[in-house]
Amino acid sequence: KWNIIIDEIEDDKLELEAYVKKTKSKILDLAISGKLVPQDPNDEPAIELLKRINPDFEPCDNSHYENIEFDIPQNWVWATIGDIFEHNTGKALNASNPNGTMLDYITTSNLYWDRFELSIIKQMPFTESEIERCIVRKGDLLICEGGDVGRAAIWEYDYNIMIQNHIHRLRGKVDICTRYFFYLFMHYKLHNLIGGKGVAIQGLSSRDLHNLIIPVPSLKEQYDIASSIDLYFSKLDMITAEL
């Protein structure tokens, strides 16, 4: 009898975990299509944000990107990662080149969804030019190039660190809500828009990343969306933590 009850509890737990996962996916769907928070007609149109970066900016045509099957609000705009971010990968380990200063760096094994595992940190030499290219500062968005392609987290620490060549570092060209774009990558990953047929199966190259088409809301709505997702996800995480 007790075994049956325990089995039923375990089944209910698995069903609830699956429901929470599905709910999170739905929240992201609504967020990325502009349906999670109310549209404010007084918000500055997103195209003005893009024109502050590049006065000659023209919205992207997403019609050729067959996996994107949702519309966006009128005051949003389709752009590319390259329109919004400066980005590059880190340094490849090269034991035959010892030039530079020994510095801590992270690899894809340190980078997980929305967190970092920093118990094991390696070092390698970086020249001055490599430091500028590979340094990660607080607020930078880091993306896995290979392995679990598109896995992402924001570096929120008060100290800098370096990255190796299988991590993309994204840094906004102007003031943006990086957390909105973090959730955008999570949404794209769930829908196989990165790491699947949407881009390259074997990895996310710098070129693929640069040309990745994304929906961009106004700056205010970026923050509103990110804070709403944070709130909903934290409540769902509390439910699963109590199982």
Regions found by a protein language model. Name each.
Residues P38-E44, D61-E66, N94-M102, I120, ...:
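Short coil/turn segments at secondary-structure boundaries
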Residues R115-S119:
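Cytochrome P450 core scaffold surrounding the K-helix E-X-X-R motif
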Residues V77-D114, I131, V149, S205:
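Low-complexity, Lys/Gly-biased intrinsically disordered segments
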Residues T107-T108, M124-M186, G195-G198, G203-S205, ...:
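A short beta-sheet element
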Residues K1-A31, K35-L36, N62-K91, N211, ...:
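Non-catalytic DNA-recognition/assembly elements of restriction-modification systems
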Residues F181, K189, Q222-I225:
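Interdomain signal-transducing alpha-helices
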Residues K21-S25, G100-L103, D140, T178-F182:
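Non-catalytic, well-ordered alpha-helical scaffold segments
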Residues S33-D56, C60:
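Short histidine
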